[in-house]
Amino acid sequence: MFVKICGITNEDDALLSVAMGADAVGFVFAPSTRQVAPQKVYDITRRLPPEILTVGVFRNEHPSRVIEIAHKAGIKAIQLHGRETPDQTKEIAGHFRWVIKAFASDDENLPNADRYGTDMLLLDAPSPGSGKLFDWSIAGDAPDSMKLILAGGLTPENVGNAVEEVRPWGVDVASGVKKEPGRKDPMKVKRFIENAKAHAIEQYRGDDNIPYDWDFE
């Protein structure tokens, strides 16, 4: 079970998430209350263990800007959370071996997500970042060929049920482990990760289990 803590805005929360067992941390570069500057993210990512996957979240950004910001920030993976086309997504994937394409649960393109040329699919609520749940059975519409990351309204209390019902490859949380704006709650982070992994059939095994070439240029 791959667990990503998203919406990281400071070094303390990044280190906390790693210490609690997170496999990845996400930084939002799209306009948002959780938006962070590339230089600040770089200062954080260089303090993290190399096995931790650092993910930059973008929305409707031109591919050249995504690539530029990602390199400045020192992140290893890209998450596209907007209306990016298959061609745009593939262009970005030409520079980053691990690109996650996010889809809202009501997106009519979900059954054809494999056209975007990524290995990873993140399934979110219709209003990303709202903290609201959606009908998990919709996950059945996602292509079987893709690794599914479930997001949207997950909390320490419901993530176990979500993992048992959907059997995703991974889970993603932001507001569900929030203490206050811009800060994570240590106990919520700990319980979320523990509950997600406790209900998983398979445990995530680090970079041996992800399609990422760390020397890829």
Question: Where are these predicted regions, by residue range?
Answer:
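Conserved N-terminal beta1-alpha1 strand-loop-helix module at the mouth
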Residues: 1-217
